[in-house]
């Protein structure tokens, strides 16, 4: 009886560990950059083995004027030329694993547009995720973006937080 119970526990634990691989998540995140900029990100993440993942994202940014007291209304912010949009992909190799949390490097590229410009970006940073029940995750990330072609905001340093929701594809 003890042997059968031990075999059942081992088989069940390997099935549960395998269930974490190749999972998909949809996520949303908010954050800001050092130059007064706010951003919102919507992404799809495909997790491969050992928490390594591919992320495909769409991001919108709003650049604030240097002096926020110049804004008399929020609508002026949306009418200004400080809006940027982009889509891209990132590879996230897992470098740190612990119980219910893991950390990944985030290396990616993006293409986008501003009102009068074309944008290309190279992204590098760190993303730390905390796992909750039923596949939900909370994450924070910090990183640097190198935006091309030559722009006044070539290097952007920022951070953000967000949530990842599991997607069940059967």
PLM feature segments, named:
Residues 9-18:
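Hydrophobic h-region of N-terminal signal peptides that target proteins for export
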Residues 45-138:
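Gram-negative (and chloroplast) outer-membrane scaffold detector with strong preference
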Residues 140-148:
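Low-complexity, intrinsically disordered Gly/Pro/Thr-rich segments
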Residues 24-28, 72-75, 109, 143:
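Extracytoplasmic loops and strand-loop junctions of Gram-negative outer membrane beta-barrel proteins
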Residues 2-8:
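Sec-dependent signal peptide recognition
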Residues 87, 153-170:
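Outer-membrane beta-barrel "beta-signal"
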């Amino acid at each position: 009886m003890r042997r059968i119970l031990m075999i059942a526990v081992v088989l069940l634990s390997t099935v549960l560990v395998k269930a974490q691989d190749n999972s998909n998540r949809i996520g949303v995140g908010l954050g800001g950059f050092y130059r007064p900029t706010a951003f919102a990100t919507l992404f799809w993440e495909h997790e491969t083995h050992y928490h390594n993942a591919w992320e495909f994202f769409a991001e919108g940014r709003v650049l604030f004027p240097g002096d926020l007291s110049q804004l008399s209304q929020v609508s002026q912010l949306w009418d200004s030329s400080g809006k940027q949009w982009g889509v891209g992909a990132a590879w996230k190799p897992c470098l740190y694993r612990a119980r219910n949390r893991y950390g990944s490097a985030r290396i990616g590229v993006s293409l986008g547009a501003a009102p009068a410009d074309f944008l290309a970006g190279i992204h590098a940073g760190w993303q730390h995720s905390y796992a909750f029940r039923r596949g939900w995750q909370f994450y924070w990330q910090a990183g640097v973006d190198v935006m091309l072609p030559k722009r006044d905001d070539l290097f952007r340093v920022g951070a953000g937080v967000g949530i990842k929701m599991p997607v069940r594809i059967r």
